[in-house]
Amino acid sequence: MAKRTKKVGIVGKYGTRYGASLRKMVKKMEITQHSRYTCPFCGKDAMRRGAVGIWNCSKCKKTVAGGAYVYGTVAAATVRSTVRRLRDLKE
């Protein structure tokens, strides 16, 4: 793996191309997409992105659909809370 500087981190591979503000936006996105997330099934910190919107747990081998760059999205959280509220209203 190539040596990156402290300041630019994962976007050091782009060098001086594309402009500083775009590289900062890409850095935030790439850090979230390459990090590990907690698996909701087994509870381990092993959920990783396999492809765009596909998240795999390396411990329990579950595959779920999620966001493109982040496992949980704002829209998914909104839908989950709405469904929970409607379910409680029905009971």
From Swiss-Prot:
Q: Which InterPro entries match?
A: Ribosomal_eL37/eL43, Ribosomal_eL43, Ribosomal_protein_eL43, Ribosomal_zn-bd
Tree of life domain: Eukaryota
SS bond list = none
* Positions of C4-type zinc fingers: 39-60
Q: Which GO terms describe its biological process?
A: translation
> Keywords for this entry?
Metal-binding, Ribonucleoprotein, Ribosomal protein, Zinc, Zinc-finger
| SUPFAM superfamilies in UniProt | Zn-binding ribosomal proteins
Tell me the GO molecular function terms.
structural constituent of ribosome; zinc ion binding
| UniProt xrefs under Pfam families | Ribosomal_L37ae (PF01780)
Q: Which GO terms describe its cellular component?
A: ribonucleoprotein complex; ribosome
Kindly give the NCBIfam families that the UniProt entry links to this protein.
Answer: eL43_euk_arch, PRK03976.1
- Describe the family membership recorded for this protein in Swiss-Prot or TrEMBL: Belongs to the eukaryotic ribosomal protein eL43 family.
Report the PANTHER family cross-referenced here. Answer: 60S RIBOSOMAL PROTEIN L37A, LARGE RIBOSOMAL SUBUNIT PROTEIN EL43
- Under what name is this protein listed? Large ribosomal subunit protein eL43
Q: Which organism is it from?
A: Ostertagia ostertagi (Brown stomach worm)
Starting at the broadest rank, the lineage of the source organism is: Eukaryota, Metazoa, Ecdysozoa, Nematoda, Chromadorea
